[in-house]
Structures are given as structure tokens and as C-alpha cells.
């Protein structure tokens, strides 16, 4: 089974993130032999993250909290380092939580 980690930095925009997770979950439901994990890097948000409803097709959601706001690029770098040091995976995908990236393109993998 192929393991794909989707790294998503977020700062306060939890509603957009929840929508994105729903779109990812819907997109991957028909993809066979795949394990999808989402790693959310919280860029020291001042709004407390909500409890997410457990998606059906995303197997795991982790949230890493930055101690201070460092910006989008630093969140990506922190997440990439974390994944390389702590996870066994086949592919790492970076997505923005603001809806700019299209989860439908996951089907092209």
C-alpha cells in the first residue's frame, strides 16, 4: 500500500482547512491501495483549532504546533523535516489550506 502524507500549514483559518480536508477525503475515496495521512502545521494560531470530524478516507490527521508564528515557508520546512525524521512514506504533498490547491489532482498520482 502506498503511503502519501499531505502537509498543510495553517494560521487561524480552520474553517478553510476543514473544507479542504473534506475535499481531500471525498477525492481519495475511490483511489485503491493508498494510505492518506494529513499533517497540519499550526503556525501559532491565535484561534484554537476545532475538533475535526474523523474523515472516512483520510486514515490519520496529526497537528504539529509551532511555538511562534514563523510564516508559511517555515511551516513547510518544519513539516518536511518532521516527516523525514519520523515517518515512513512514499510521497509528500504540500497543500495550502486556503483552497488554492485542488485536491482533485490527487487522482493523478
Residue ranges and their predicted role:
Residues 2-8, 17, 24, 36-41:
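Hydrophobic targeting segments
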Residues 13-29:
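Short, well-formed alpha-helical segments that are part of the catalytic scaffolds
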Residues 24, 95, 102-109:
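A short, amphipathic alpha-helix embedded in the catalytic core of nucleotide-handling enzymes
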Residues 42-50, 99-100:
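A conserved acidic beta->alpha catalytic loop
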Residues 53-86:
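Conserved donor nucleotide-binding strand/loop of the catalytic core
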Residues 88-100:
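Short beta-strand-to-loop acidic/aromatic patch adjacent to the donor-nucleotide binding site
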Amino acid at each position: 500500500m502506498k503511503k502519501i502524507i499531505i502537509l498543510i500549514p495553517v494560521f487561524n483559518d480552520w474553517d478553510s482547512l476543514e473544507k479542504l480536508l473534506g475535499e481531500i477525503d471525498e477525492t481519495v475515496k475511490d483511489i485503491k491501495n493508498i494510505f492518506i495521512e494529513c499533517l497540519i502545521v499550526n503556525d501559532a494560531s491565535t484561534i484554537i483549532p476545532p475538533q475535526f470530524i474523523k474523515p472516512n478516507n483520510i486514515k490519520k490527521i496529526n497537528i504539529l504546533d509551532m511555538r511562534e508564528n514563523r510564516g508559511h515557508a517555515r511551516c513547510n520546512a518544519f513539516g518536511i523535516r518532521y516527516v523525514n525524521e519520523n515517518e515512513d512514506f512514499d510521497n509528500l504533498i504540500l497543500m495550502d489550506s486556503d483552497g488554492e490547491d485542488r485536491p482533485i489532482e490527487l487522482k493523478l498520482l
